[in-house]
Regions:
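Catalytic nucleophile-loop/oxyanion-hole region of alpha/beta-hydrolase
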Residues: 53-85
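Short, surface-exposed "cap/lid" segments of acyl-processing enzymes
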Residues: 1-56
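Flexible extramembrane linkers and terminal tails adjacent to transmembrane helices
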Residues: 84-86, 110-123
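Short glycine-enriched nucleophile-adjacent loop
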Residues: 100-111
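Gly/Ser/Thr-rich loops at beta-strand to alpha-helix junctions
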Residues: 25-28, 93-100, 135
Length: 144
């Protein structure tokens, strides 16, 4: 699994948008950083990571679940450390790698009431999907 990278503008506070970005399968951090740099220039704090190939298309969900948990745990920790626990939260899922993260968060109710990350779910103000309108399955995933 790739690392999780936090990037913040020089000035941020309780109302600064916090955007969690799950990158596409095969992305390099330098490519994903171009997107988060744009968000940072608009005044957003960002957290980014890329899910590994095996986890994306494994018939077992444990790797995808661990990736989603790790991303949300890092978001929770960063928001608390930065005094942004109540800031608006946006989730951005890019192509098949990112959309598998969304699928997993939804399947396991991670952000729902009673879910492991319900504290974050209460602050989600929007979700952005980039380049993955298809329902992800092991059969169509490699084609998307």
């Amino acid at each position: 699994m790739a690392g999780v990278v936090l990037d913040a503008p020089d000035v941020f506070g309780e109302t600064t948008p916090f955007v969690v970005v799950a990158g596409w399968l095969g992305a390099k951090d330098r490519n994903l950083k171009k997107y988060t740099d744009e968000l940072k220039a608009m005044g957003c704090c960002t957290l980014r990571s890329i899910q590994g190939s095996w986890d994306c298309f494994s018939p077992l969900s444990s790797g995808r679940r661990e990736f989603a948990r790790r991303l949300l745990t890092k978001a929770r920790e960063a928001r608390a450390t930065m005094g942004m626990s109540k800031s608006p939260l946006y989730l951005m899922f890019m192509s098949n790698g990112g959309c598998w993260a969304h699928c997993t968060m939804t399947q396991f109710g991670m952000l729902d009431s009673g879910g492991e990350f319900e504290d974050l779910g209460a602050h989600v103000k929007g979700k952005v999907f980039d380049s993955s309108p298809a329902k992800m399955t092991l059969r169509n995933g490699p084609k998307v």
